[in-house]
C-alpha cells in the first residue's frame, strides 16, 4: 500500500500552531468499534478500561471519553449488546488516574439535568477538577422505547431545543448552585446543587447537523466530528469549516475534535492486510440493524452523525475516519489532521486498545510534529 499522506514539513511557528490534543475513546461496549467477527472479541470491564486509561495517561494522552449505549445492534458479534454505564465508569477511572482529563456521556433523555449536575460535581471532586460532560440527545429510538421514555418521533426535530434547556439548567447549577429555570421541557423551583465544581465544568457535544453545530457554537467548549474515509486525513475539513462558521454567529471559540480509528503496524502492507481481514468478517446482521435505525429519523436532514455511521463505504467501523498504515504513515497523516483550520484535537480508537495505545506512544507519537512538545516527556516514559 502506498503512503496516502505526503510527508509534511513545518516551521517552528507552524509546529506551535499545529499542537494537537489526543484523546482515547475508551471501549465501554463490547468489541470496541469494529463490527466484525474477525476483530478482537471482548467484553467491557472496569479492569480493561482502567488499564487503557492508565496506559493513555502514561503516554501523555490529554483526555479519555466514554460514550453511553443502552441497546446494541445484535448480530453474530452481539455488537454493543454489552455496555457499562458512562458516569460510574468514569468516576472509577478518575480515582485511578492523576493527570488525564476525564469525560462521561449523559444520555439526556434518561437523566434529569439536576442529577447530572450533582454527579458531575461529585466526579469533579474525585478527579481534582479533571472532569467534563458530553451531552447527547439520543438517536437510537429502541434504546429509549425499551424503557417507555421515548418522547415520540417529533423529538427528532426538537431534540436541540430540549438540549438547550438542559444545558441552561446545568450552567445555572454549576455556576450559582441554584436554578429557577422555566421552559417547555424543564421547570426548576429553587433547585439546589452544592458543592459546585471546583473549576468551570467543560461541556462537549458531537453535533454534525446544522442544529447540532449551532448548539455547540452557543454552549459547548468543543465539538466532536467524524473523520471521513480511509487514509484521507483531511476529508473532514468541510465539517470543521462549518463549525468555524457557526461560531462566527456566537463569537465563541469552539474547536473541532475529530474521531479516527488507528490501525498501525511495521509496514503499510501488513496493516492493509489486517484492515481487509476485518472488513471480510463484517457482521452483516449487526450492520443491517444500524442501517435500519439510521432511517428512523426522517426529520433531521442528511447531515447527522447516524447517517454517516450507516454509510456502507466503511460501515465495519461505523464510518469513522480510519488511518491504516505503518507507524510513520499514521504519524504523517495525524500531522495532516492538525493542519486543518479549526481542528484542535483527535479522539482515537484502536483495533486493539492496549497494544494500540502502547505502539502509538512508543512508535507513532514521537514522529508527530504536532506532538513535538512532548518529546522530552516521551523520552522519560519510553
From Swiss-Prot:
Check the record and name the Gene3D superfamilies matching this protein: Luciferase-like domain (3.20.20.30)
Question: Listed disulfide bonds for this chain?
Answer: none
Relate the induction remark in this record.
Up-regulated by the nitrogen regulatory protein C (NtrC also called GlnG) and repressed by RutR.
Q: Name one GO biological process term.
A: alkanesulfonate catabolic process
- Catalyzed reactions per annotation: uracil + FMNH2 + NADH + O2 = (Z)-3-ureidoacrylate + FMN + NAD(+) + H2O + H(+); thymine + FMNH2 + NADH + O2 = (Z)-2-methylureidoacrylate + FMN + NAD(+) + H2O + H(+)
**Listed SUPFAM superfamilies:** Bacterial luciferase-like
Which of this chain's residues are annotated to bind FMN? 68-69, 134, 143, 159-160, 209
EC number(s) per entry: 1.14.99.46
Task: For this UniProt record, give its keywords in alphabetical order, as a comma-separated list.
Answer: Flavoprotein, FMN, Monooxygenase, NADP, Oxidoreductase
The coiled-coil regions, if any, are none
What is this enzyme's class at the first EC digit?
oxidoreductase
Which GO molecular function annotations are given, in alphabetical order? Answer: alkanesulfonate monooxygenase activity; uracil oxygenase activity
Q: Briefly, what is this protein's role?
A: The FMN-N(5)-oxide reacts spontaneously with NADH to produce FMN. Requires the flavin reductase RutF to regenerate FMN in vivo.
Family, according to the entry, reads as follows: Belongs to the NtaA/SnaA/DszA monooxygenase family. RutA subfamily.
What is the official name of this protein in its record? Pyrimidine monooxygenase RutA
Organism expressing this protein natively: Shigella flexneri
